């Protein structure tokens, strides 16, 4: 049947009717709230490019986790800002690292909160890359790792033109550090391990290490399709993790490639991922949708810092209605097929949903 018998506006006449037939619903339990944890006590420093988001000390992280839990938010994910950085990413895998300390404190003080650990090395490496960096030598068989000068600046090696040709992120050597980091986080009480580095084989290496350490029931949420995106800028300020040279396009995905994203997801599933993630969310809704069509495991999506800051800028200038665009943006991600959404709006959205 068609018009005038069929009138789709009939079911749009009131809030109650619209709610009755709504196809996509948001719930606070589907949100994951990111926290940036730094050294100190009583620290709550707003991030300039992310209004309303803060670098916080462990004690403040406990209170944030408590509030998020009280609002029904599904979980939190921790990112660490270590006191010192080095080329072994020591702060990522030592048992007294900032994320490990925060995890123990939160699990001790906030009952039943789900804590997810981001496993990446960029925040902990002095050069800001997600793996071990080696400079390719002009003569065969002779290469040396990049070094930072004693004054904190780049050394002669690092100040040379940093291109994809001259520098290499060592994939297999990085896996050992990632695995150590995952086990250390699990020992601290982390509920879910979430590798975001985009090294080949990291899920399998982490799964093996967790199992050997006795953490057979600790699930892995893999950042399986993480794209080399321009939307990460504010996060890199928040986590002090911008690369000191070059970029991350040799390991993060090309944003033009949908089929390759499906291969990445498939490989991570075969290696033992229990859940997968697409990052960023908004520019890659088609990737989320295709992943939902092909795979039957839980799918997460990250509404990243650039998405958040872009909306916040328009909201603060009065160009967009705050409450509407928060929920509309999250609904689009959910409608595309994401079961979980990592978002800096988690607490705000939970309050709006009541």
Map each language-model feature to its residues.
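General helical structural elements
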Residues: 22, 70, 152, 156-158, ...
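Intrinsically disordered, low-complexity sequence elements enriched in Ser/Thr/Gly/Pro
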Residues: 5-10, 20, 139, 146, ...
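Intrinsic disorder/low-complexity segments
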Residues: 137-165
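An N-cap/entry alpha-helix motif that binds or orients negatively charged groups
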Residues: 1-59
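Alpha/beta enzyme core
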Residues: 42-46, 51-137, 163-297, 302-354
């Amino acid at each position: 049947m068609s018009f005038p018998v069929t009138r789709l506006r009939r079911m749009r006449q009131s809030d109650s009717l619209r709610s009755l037939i709504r196809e996509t619903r948001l719930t606070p339990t589907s949100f994951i709230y990111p926290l940036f944890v730094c050294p100190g006590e009583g620290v709550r420093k707003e991030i300039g490019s992310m209004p309303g988001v803060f670098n916080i000390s462990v004690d403040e992280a406990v209170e944030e986790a408590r509030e998020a839990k009280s609002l029904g938010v599904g979980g939190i994910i921790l990112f660490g800002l270590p006191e010192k950085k080095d080329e072994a990413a020591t702060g990522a895998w030592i048992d007294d690292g900032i994320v490990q300390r925060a995890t123990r404190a939160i699990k001790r003080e906030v009952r039943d909160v789900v804590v997810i650990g981001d496993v990446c090395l960029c925040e902990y490496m002095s050069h800001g890359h997600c793996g071990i960096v080696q400079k390719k030598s002009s003569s065969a068989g002779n290469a040396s790792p990049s070094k930072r000068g004693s004054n904190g600046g780049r050394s002669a090696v690092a100040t040379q033109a940093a291109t994809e040709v001259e520098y290499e992120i060592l994939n297999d050597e990085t896996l050992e550090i990632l695995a150590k980091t995952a086990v250390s986080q699990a020992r601290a009480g982390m509920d879910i391990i979430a590798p975001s580095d985009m090294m080949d084989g990291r899920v399998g290496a982490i799964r093996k290490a967790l199992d050997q350490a006795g953490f057979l029931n600790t699930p892995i949420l893999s950042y399986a399709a993480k794209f080399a995106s321009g939307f990460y800028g504010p996060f890199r300020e928040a986590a002090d993790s911008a690369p000191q040279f070059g970029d991350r396009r040799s390991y993060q995905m090309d944003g033009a490639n949908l089929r390759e994203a499906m291969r990445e997801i498939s490989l991570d599933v075969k290696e033992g991922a229990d859940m997968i993630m697409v990052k960023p969310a908004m520019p890659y809704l088609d990737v989320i949708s295709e992943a939902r069509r092909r795979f039957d495991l839980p799918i997460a999506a990250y509404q990243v810092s650039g998405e958040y800051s872009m909306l916040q800028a328009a909201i603060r200038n009065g160009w967009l209605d705050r409450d509407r665009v928060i929920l509309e943006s999250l609904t689009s991600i959910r409608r595309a097929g994401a079961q979980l959404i990592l978002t800096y709006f988690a607490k705000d959205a939970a309050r709006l949903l009541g």
